Amino acid sequence: MSLLTEVETHTRSGWECRCNDSSDPLVIAASIIGILHLILWILDRLFFKCIYRRLKYGLKRGPSTEGVPESMREEYQQEKQSAVDVDDGHFVNIELE
């Protein structure tokens, strides 16, 4: 018998899973946190472009345009459009007031 199989056999009995039917609150909390973390990570990877663009550009409101001539409003809207519109194969929904 080689030394490798002896070591594997020896450690295998020492690392048995003892938490199959465990009702320890710490084990349950760790499992729930792990599952939630996995779900949030998957959602983040699927929708990261939408989420971060919305946070970066969607929540910012521009300055008030009251009393500003129409030509300057259009220029501001065009600048805002060019700042948000990124050509990477995805469409960006922009709602103009």
UniProtKB/Swiss-Prot annotation:
Pfam families: Flu_M2. Residues 60-84 are annotated as: Disordered. Glycans are attached at residue 20. The modification Phosphoserine is found at residues 64, 82. The chain crosses the membrane at residues 23-43. It is found in: Virion membrane; Host apical cell membrane. Residues 1-22 are virion surface. It is a single-pass type III membrane protein. GO terms for cellular component: host cell plasma membrane; membrane; virion membrane. It comes from the Viruses. Residues 44-97 are intravirion. The record marks 41 as: Seems to be involved in pH gating. A lipid is attached at residue 50 (S-palmitoyl cysteine). GO terms for molecular function: monoatomic ion channel activity; proton transmembrane transporter activity. The M2 protein from most influenza A strains is inhibited by amantadine and rimantadine, resulting in viral uncoating incapacity. Emergence of amantadine-resistant variants is usually rapid. The record marks 37 as: Essential for channel activity, possibly by being protonated during channel activation, and by forming the channel gate and the selective filter. Forms a proton-selective ion channel that is necessary for the efficient release of the viral genome during virus entry. After attaching to the cell surface, the virion enters the cell by endocytosis. Acidification of the endosome triggers M2 ion channel activity. Homotetramer; composed of two disulfide-linked dimers held together by non-covalent interactions. May interact with matrix protein 1. This is Matrix protein 2. The gene is M.
